[in-house]
Amino acid sequence: MAEIKPAEISAILKKQVEGFESGATLEEVGSVLQVGDGIARIYGLSNVQYGELVEFDNGLEGIVLNLEEDNVGVVLLGASTGIKEGSTAKRTQRIASLKVGEQMVGRVVNTLGFPIDGKGPIGGDLYEMPLERKAPGVIFRQPVTEPLQTGIKAVDAMIPVGRGQRELVIGDRQTGKSTVCIDTILNQKEFYDAGKPVFCIYVAIGQKASTVAGIAKMLEEKGAMAYTVIVAANASDPAPMQVYAPMAGAAIGEYFRDSGRPALIVYDDLSKQAVAYREVSLLLRRPPGREAYPGDVFYLHSRLLERACKVIADDDIAKNMNDLPDSLKSIVKGGGSLTALPIIETQAGDVSAYIPTNVISITDGQIFLDGDLFNSGVRPAINVGISVSRVGGNAQIKSMKKVAGTLKLDQAQFRELEAFAKFGSDLDAVTLNVIEKGKRNVEILKQGLNSPYTVEDQVAIIYAGSKNLLKNVPVNKVREFEKDFIEYLNNKHRDTLDALKAGKLDDKITDVIEATAKELSAKYN
């Protein structure tokens, strides 16, 4: 029989007692009173904070948005299946966040940052970024001075966008709003290829899954997914996911911005976000205001769009930025930027409705797309009279600024005279000249789908148009002339185009452009 050694047994017991950990932890738990339509009312979470995440017994999370006397209103970040009256919900003592990293580029993710493109989990170093975050304070910003080239002639010439600007794209449905923004993303390939990428985030809110899949496929084919992230909250997703999708996109953009790099974010579109927010607010029984939107819908958009800015170039100041997530503190650099292109859909061109006026007043200008222009074949259908860029002019390259200086005025004058000319046929030579030049400029500013232009090509053709060098070219042949003109300059005078790209515009350059235009327009005589 084996001998029992008391000393050995007591040593083992001592060791086990030392390693014993109490499994009991203090958790604040509440119970679900009511659930439905993506909203749960919970009793018992008396110390919960506004905006805090709560976790249900099936693992689903929700955000606390209403704090009432005897219960809290929680919006669910997912389907409510599995949650019923009496289910438990516990505090997590953290706010909604997502994990962002370099390997998120090229992926399609949902509002919570989880991939939905079937390409497996996102690897590499990931940094936790809060969905909601205070915008950088005044001392952490600097004025917009660098251009963000959209590749769209009408925009880069007349409504220029700078890095760190918020430029609204507004218009009726089917007027090419998304196309303007997607072309801008495609145009950043030039900078990616040159090793100076502008990281792009496309946020699709309340769109059909097939539409988002089509956009992802097109960006992939054009090589643009190499620097783009798509955040998708589809039409079938719960309203809270659609409300928070733009915040998720902004958090991804802030990761690039705060690490000293330029980023561009497209919100497509904020009208659908406002509708989803209205739905959530009404279900939470908040009092409705104008058009049944809640009173804080302005604040919803302003706090989102203020997160886009140009960060001060001084690293030491940038490191002290307000509300900086702890995870980012080791990689913060100054000089980054986040440019926002929010999209708003109008009803029958009414820009004086509630949401359009709100967003117009928040942003630094707007690109207004006109249904009538679109239907008459002017694409992109930009209404130059109503469109404006409040800060982008400082960011234009010098050559473009010189060339496009009078273009906006010329086109506004042309539209006025064109309307006047419909009433009478007897026009003097000066008026006829303005109308003929205007018609050719309209043709020059037309552009095909997904075909952005480099800035030097834009400057060259706009110079030719503004100096009336195309007067001998029939209006219906202007697009053909433009193609030949740009091809000729690229083949024979690449040095001239490089000088234009660098911002130069002297007599030597203008002589080359004028001689080329004269030579090529001769065949139309």
UniProtKB/Swiss-Prot annotation:
Q: Which UniProt keywords apply?
A: ATP synthesis, ATP-binding, Cell inner membrane, Cell membrane, CF(1), Hydrogen ion transport, Ion transport, Membrane, Nucleotide-binding, Translocase, Transport
Q: In Gene Ontology terms, what is one molecular function of this protein?
A: ATP binding
Could you give one GO CC term from the UniProt record? Answer: plasma membrane
* PROSITE patterns per the UniProt record, alphabetical: ATPASE_ALPHA_BETA
Q: Where is this site: Required for activity?
A: 387
| Documented EC number(s) | 7.1.2.2
Q: What class of enzyme is it?
A: translocase
Q: Would I find Nucleotide-binding among this entry's keywords?
A: yes
Self-association and partners: F-type ATPases have 2 components, CF(1) - the catalytic core - and CF(0) - the membrane proton channel. CF(1) has five subunits: alpha(3), beta(3), gamma(1), delta(1), epsilon(1). CF(0) has three main subunits: a(1), b(2) and c(9-12). The alpha and beta chains form an alternating ring which encloses part of the gamma chain. CF(1) is attached to CF(0) by a central stalk formed by the gamma and epsilon chains, while a peripheral stalk is formed by the delta and b chains.
Q: Which family does this protein fall into?
A: Belongs to the ATPase alpha/beta chains family.
Q: Enumerate the NCBIfam families for this protein.
A: atpA, PRK13343.1
* Name of protein: ATP synthase subunit alpha
Whose protein is this, by species? Flavobacterium psychrophilum (strain ATCC 49511 / DSM 21280 / CIP 103535 / JIP02/86)
Gene symbol of the encoding locus? atpA
